[in-house]
Amino acid sequence: MLASGLLLAALLACLTVMILLSVWRQRKLWGKLPPGPTPLPFIGNYLQLNTEQMYDSLMKISERYGPVFTIHLGPRRIVVLCGQEAVKEALVDQAEDFSGRGELATFDWLFKGYGVVFSSWERARPLRRFAISTLRDFGVGKRGIEERIQEEAGFLIEAFRDTRGAFIDPTFFLSRTVSNVISSIVFGDRFDYEDKEFLSLLRMMLGSFQFTATPTGQLYEMFYSVMKHLPGPQQQAFKELEGLRDFIAKKVERNQRTLDPNSPRDFIDSFLIRMQEEKKDPKSEFHMKNLVMTTLNLFFAGTETVSTTMRYGFLLLMKHPDVEAKVHEEIDRVIGRNRQPKFEDRAKMPYTEAVIHEIQRFTDMIPMGLAHRVTRDTKFRDFLLPKGAEVFPMLGSVLKDPKFFSKPREFYPQHFLDEKGQFKKSDAFMPFSVGKRYCLGEGLARMELFLFFTTIMQNFRFRSQQAPQDIDVSPKHVGFATIPRTYTMSFVPR
């Protein structure tokens, strides 16, 4: 009896030691993480989160735990950074440590770690360097791409004139125009506005982009290991992404058949040439998977973010006709009605520049940023983040940081104007992110936004079917992306 009692005590002691060792190993493995709400097994902090307002849910948690905290999205453990100081400290001051890429489950289903956007830093580094250089070769940042944007703006103006002042949904007018600019770089040509395949591609992009902002999309980010096997809207998003990938693959096959290594026609040609140059290097990142996925990255990002920002911008200007009138006045004074706007005009147009910046700030297109990952055990403030820890840099919390913006929840162009009415930069303006993984299309997007906005407003006044005070500028969805409400408007010739 005594022996069995001693044996039981010994077994309990061993079990206790094993549990303590396991806890110690877990603590060592996960370092000293920031505080956060206690998670439940598998579902994490799901009960404390509202998938219809994920950004607001996380910001509410930050009120209790501070600007750096830990949250569990289902089984995913995430370190969340809020406010300009924390985000800059991580992505700029400790850029190398935070240069990894975290998960975005909807897109990871297709990309699987390939392509310039959703890959690790080791893979992304040579792809980014190549993409930036090649975009420059095809005119980005130069007069060449400015002329391409001006040409496309001309087609858009004619399309709006053809509506004869009728009330229309501007969504696909804008997306096909913006998409044609990046298409001319990656595919070497533009699409006709009525091309059925082109319109189908735009619907696929819009559908999958909007899915990431929906409550179901946010739920999928938490429980994708289960939901990817279930019926639901996520399956439609997968089909749309597959359709986009197949389209890119066809374009690549066409280019392969007609490639002239001495005369690249577009981004795809340039990548194929680089593949040939490095075909004997087994570690090269220049292979077919990265070609298809990087081209899709550029095509998708180069279409949706700018066109959605413009669509939201039109809604804001109809809500604030006084702002629209001031932009019209500045355009008439600086540019007039007899020539197209040029990118260099913005230096003389501080109010228009401020309005465009405020549209980007207010719309807050990617509020939670793309997830990052620390590339090694990293000391951050008083915490120790283990290698591989996922990080959400909350870009929306930077764009709405009250330390930098006096009316963070309002549309207020004066945020970017000094007391003399001159344009004023802000350290908290980072809609394209910052650090090593900043948006590589930032320069192109800035030029597009200025030239498209000024050209459209040079030619038209905006009219809504609602009175300004009745226009709802709150977003339709806020998840990975911010999606404006669907609306109609009239383009009235000036």
Swiss-Prot record:
This is Cytochrome P450 2A10. GO terms for molecular function: arachidonate epoxygenase activity; heme binding; iron ion binding; oxidoreductase activity, acting on paired donors, with incorporation or reduction of molecular oxygen, reduced flavin or flavoprotein as one donor, and incorporation of one atom of oxygen. It is a peripheral membrane protein. It holds the Pfam family p450. InterPro entries: Cyt_P450, Cyt_P450_CS, Cyt_P450_E_grp-I, Cyt_P450_E_grp-I_CYP2A-like, Cyt_P450_sf, Cytochrome_P450_fam2. It comes from Oryctolagus cuniculus. The gene is CYP2A10. Heme binds at residue 439. It is an enzyme of class 1 (oxidoreductase). Keywords: Acetylation, Endoplasmic reticulum, Heme, Iron, Membrane, Metal-binding, Microsome, Monooxygenase, Oxidoreductase. Catalyzes the oxygenation of a variety of substrates, including ethanol and procarcinogens such as N-nitrosodiethylamine and phenacetin. Exhibits a high coumarin 7-hydroxylase activity. Converts also testosterone to androstenedione. Expressed in liver and lung as well as in nasal tissues. SUPFAM superfamilies: Cytochrome P450 (SSF48264). The modification N6-acetyllysine is found at residue 379.
